[in-house]
Amino acid sequence: MKLAAIDVGLKRIGTAICLDGRIVMPQNAILRKNRNQAAHDVVSFLEEWEIEKLVVGLPKGGSSSEEMERRIQHFVSLLELDIPVVYQDEQGSSFEAKEMTQGQFRHKKDGKIDSIAAKIILERHLSL
């Protein structure tokens, strides 16, 4: 089964795929100009890779997690997908991504960290 994960942020959406059930690869992040454009770009990404299941990072715990959870679920509803969508705890994934890449490249706002966070989210889902 071909899987994808997204790490939904306010400015960028990190993406990762797993096509063989074993190897998870981060992909280019999607720049979020507005909700509709971002939703369209996510759907195009899923169609391009013929994804059969989407894993979405969802924050659990923390002071602002309820608001972000609501925003993420609303964003996912805009996708109008015909494939299964599951939510995976994303707590600490962005911090872990920054730790993993420390010194490898400058932490520019190009979405690399977001997509590595999506990779971590998908790896967590696969290890369940």
Swiss-Prot record:
Pfam families: RuvX (PF03652). One of its GO terms (molecular function) is nuclease activity. SUPFAM superfamilies: Ribonuclease H-like. Its EC number is 3.1.-.-. GO terms for biological process: rRNA 5'-end processing. Keywords: Cytoplasm, Hydrolase, Nuclease, Ribosome biogenesis. It is an enzyme of class 3 (hydrolase). InterPro entries: RNaseH-like_sf, YqgF, YqgF/RNaseH-like_dom, YqgF/RNaseH-like_dom_sf. It comes from the Bacteria. CDD domains: YqgF. GO terms for cellular component: cytosol. Its main location: cytoplasm. SMART domains: YqgFc. It is found in: Cytoplasm. Belongs to the YqgF nuclease family. Could be a nuclease involved in processing of the 5'-end of pre-16S rRNA. HAMAP family: Nuclease_YqgF. This is Putative pre-16S rRNA nuclease. It comes from Sulfurovum sp. (strain NBC37-1). The lineage of its organism: Bacteria, Pseudomonadati, Campylobacterota, Epsilonproteobacteria, Campylobacterales.
